[in-house]
Amino acid sequence: MSSPRGATQTATQKATAAAPGRRADPNASLILVRLRGTVRLNGKIADTMEMLRLNRPNHAVVIPRTESYMGMVGKVKDYVAYGDIDAATMAALIKTRGRVMGDKPIDDAFVKAATADKYATVDAFAAAVASGKATMKDLGEDAKPVFRLNPPVGGFKGSTKKHFTVKGELGYRGKEINELIKRMI
């Protein structure tokens, strides 16, 4: 990843460079969990949180790893924890916290109907989302894009004001985000 002198790094390179030893699949989806509230929040960061649909603490969204999304992630990194979600955690998240309009759970029948038989089960769809081959938008407008999570069982292990690299909870966590998500489901 050497670049010519004076060239700027892309947002994806910055996010993965900040976490040495934990290089991510460039196509894998990211999960973002908002950890901090709205008090003393800069207006531009609040707008970015709204665009990401992270309006409350303990809300999570799954996003593709694109240039525009990575720019937004870079802006809100001091208020969210994010990382690479695996298929098993994604399946558990969709089954337990995924909702359709009317507050009904997402099940195999809904996934099969919404994806026009492309994915027969929630597990198959979750694997496709985790690998970046599908997005949550593929479920249509009836599926809610936000997962409302609980605070983690056992509490946060570090400060919600410090980054993960300095024994906090914020910022890029790589695959270790899956442990946090499982405790929040």
Question: How does the language model describe each region?
Answer:
Residues 2-185:
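Core subunits and conserved enzymes of cellular information-processing
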